[in-house]
């Protein structure tokens, strides 16, 4: 394989700012911001708006929002 073709794959911390959930994993992403992890080392910090810790589908707080009666309109159109 060629040298210097693939991006570097390093440890990073992803921080879900909505739920204040942090996870240490590996990624090709990098950041100038760092955070001290539980093991005492500094890792690049990637802030995300939503993750599995805060997404309604994964948290079980999923609800259907009917905007403008679309569901009723659909059910009337295709009712048997």
Swiss-Prot record:
Keywords of the record, alphabetical order, are: Ribonucleoprotein, Ribosomal protein
User: Cell division: present as a keyword of the record?
Assistant: no
Q: Which PROSITE patterns match?
A: RIBOSOMAL_L31 (PS01143)
Q: Name one GO biological process term.
A: translation
Q: Which Pfam family, an example, fits this chain?
A: Ribosomal_L31
> Does Ribonucleoprotein show up as a keyword for this record?
yes
Question: Matching SUPFAM superfamilies, A to Z?
Answer: L28p-like
Q: A Gene Ontology molecular-function term?
A: structural constituent of ribosome
**What InterPro entries does the entry give?**
Ribosomal_bL28/bL31-like_sf, Ribosomal_bL31, Ribosomal_bL31_B, Ribosomal_bL31_sf
Q: Which GO terms describe its cellular component?
A: ribonucleoprotein complex; ribosome
Q: Which family does it belong to?
A: Belongs to the bacterial ribosomal protein bL31 family. Type B subfamily.
Query: What PANTHER family does the database record attribute to this sequence?
Result: 50S RIBOSOMAL PROTEIN L31, CHLOROPLASTIC, LARGE RIBOSOMAL SUBUNIT PROTEIN BL31A
- NCBIfam families of this UniProt entry? L31, PRK01678.1
Quaternary structure and partners: Part of the 50S ribosomal subunit.
Q: What name is this protein filed under?
A: Large ribosomal subunit protein bL31B
Q: What is the lineage of its organism?
A: Bacteria, Pseudomonadati, Pseudomonadota, Gammaproteobacteria, Lysobacterales
